[in-house]
Amino acid sequence: MPQSFKELGVAKWLSESLEAMKIHSPTSIQSACIPEILKGRDCIGGAKTGSGKTIAFAALMLTQWSQDPFGIFGLILTPTRELALQIAEQFAALGALMNIKVCVVVGGEDFVKQTLELQKKPHFVIATPGRLADHILNSGEETVSGLRRIKYLVLDEADRLLSNSFGSDLQRCFTILPPSEKRQTLLFTATVTDAVKALKDKPRAEGKLPVFLHQVDAGVDQIAIPKTLSTMYVFVPSYVKEAYLTSILKLPKYEESTAVVFVNRTMTAEVLRRMLRKLEFKVASLHSEMPQTERTNSLHRFKAGAARILIATDVASRGLDIPTVELVVNFDIPADPDDFIHRVGRTARAGRKGDAISIIGEKDIERIESIEERINKKMELLEGVDDDKVINDSLQKATTAKREAMLDMDKESFGERRKVNKKKRAVEEPSGKRQQKKVKKVKS
């Protein structure tokens, strides 16, 4: 395997940038994919979270761009706003020496500002399909014309993008792009699903090289959890889950650890955030009902160490670069075993040890059995937390804090704000049309 990025064909200036960022040797997915993509092949790259997929496509795109630096050179589509912002940060850091221009096109940000940035033809656009589709529909040819010349299209977390929920928006995005024979298409994912794999065998345009498919550490059914990850569980009645959570977070082993606590619902995330703050934990949250500025600030606080605990829905479980997490807690058990694997992929990265603890009740047993079958590993019983300890140390305080948190949310009409936010999203396209009128006024 190549020992340096220079051996892979990465530009000298970029190799130096990687060295400056303490990224010395390419990972398996980078070593396999970069040379093949530089040959002109489309690519499907499958590797578990934390294996360096972003650099695998960013390094080669920046290498090629530096030889012909026009805009818009590449489009990266990704399912979440947070992931788009993170990818943009990595592009900006890698391309700092060459003064690259990156535009992020996601919901929750100023539509007019995005329109003006797109009109300036940035070198790279990183977008969520819904917001980019909105611009294609409503912002006019001057705004999106640069997308007609792109050399690279990247679908990051391709398994999610190819699901039904993104179908119509993705198709609309494709209408503005060059035909497949005039661009390279790169798909990267932690889960190489049948839908992703089927793209390899689609008919190719004349002269197009075969698609390159590479999977790393596929393990059982295409996904493996890190070998340095310990998976544990605690079996509890549902009405004392919060007390068990606080007891786990106060264990001597974890009292100073960074932790991500995953939940299935935004309401649960908000209750836990407020409850844990009342119990004097340093906590932040990340869920879809938060305004974009709050979500960004929460992630920055957690990364900077201002918050030790991040309460998150699955919006945070895919691809987000939170390298120092030592503990993952599944407060709620996901219905899909793959979501469990992506969640626990937040810890035990790059050979470091990490723990994943699942708080389970009677209704979760079937889900846990499916997860254990998927990862080919039995979870171990968590030691150090039992009924007596929880009753004596945490139950009353957690119950009181939860009740106060829910009363606060009721006073602030949190549930009503959720309904308003849903209505806003439902009328997003008409909103885009209104914003288009504002753009015309700005230009006139």
Curated annotation (Swiss-Prot):
UniProt superkingdom: Eukaryota
Any one Gene Ontology BP term: endonucleolytic cleavage in ITS1 to separate SSU-rRNA from 5.8S rRNA and LSU-rRNA from tricistronic rRNA transcript (SSU-rRNA, 5.8S rRNA, LSU-rRNA)
Enzyme Commission number(s) from the entry: 3.6.4.13
InterPro entries, per the entry: DEAD/DEAH_box_helicase_dom, DEAD_box_RNA_helicase, Helicase_ATP-bd, Helicase_C-like, P-loop_NTPase, RNA-helicase_DEAD-box_CS, RNA_helicase_DEAD_Q_motif
All residue ranges annotated as the Helicase C-terminal domain in the record: 244-390
Bias kind Basic residues: ranges: 434-444
Subcellular location: Nucleus, Nucleolus
Keyword field: ATP-binding, Helicase, Hydrolase, Nucleotide-binding, Nucleus, Ribosome biogenesis, RNA-binding, rRNA processing
Example GO molecular function: ATP binding
Positions annotated to bind ATP: 47-54
Reaction catalyzed: ATP + H2O = ADP + phosphate + H(+)
Motif (DEAD box): 156-159
Motif Q motif, chain ranges: 3-31
Ranges for region Disordered: 402-444
A GO CC annotation given for this chain: nucleolus
Compositional bias ranges of the Basic and acidic residues kind: 402-418
Uppermost EC category: hydrolase
Pfam families: DEAD, Helicase_C
Positions of the Helicase ATP-binding domain: 34-210
Stated family: Belongs to the DEAD box helicase family. DDX49/DBP8 subfamily.
Domain free text: The Q motif is unique to and characteristic of the DEAD box family of RNA helicases and controls ATP binding and hydrolysis.
Function: ATP-binding RNA helicase involved in 40S ribosomal subunit biogenesis and is required for the normal formation of 18S rRNAs through pre-rRNA processing at A0, A1 and A2 sites. Required for vegetative growth.
Name of the protein in its database record: ATP-dependent RNA helicase DBP8
Source species of the chain: Lodderomyces elongisporus (strain ATCC 11503 / CBS 2605 / JCM 1781 / NBRC 1676 / NRRL YB-4239)
Gene from which the chain derives: DBP8
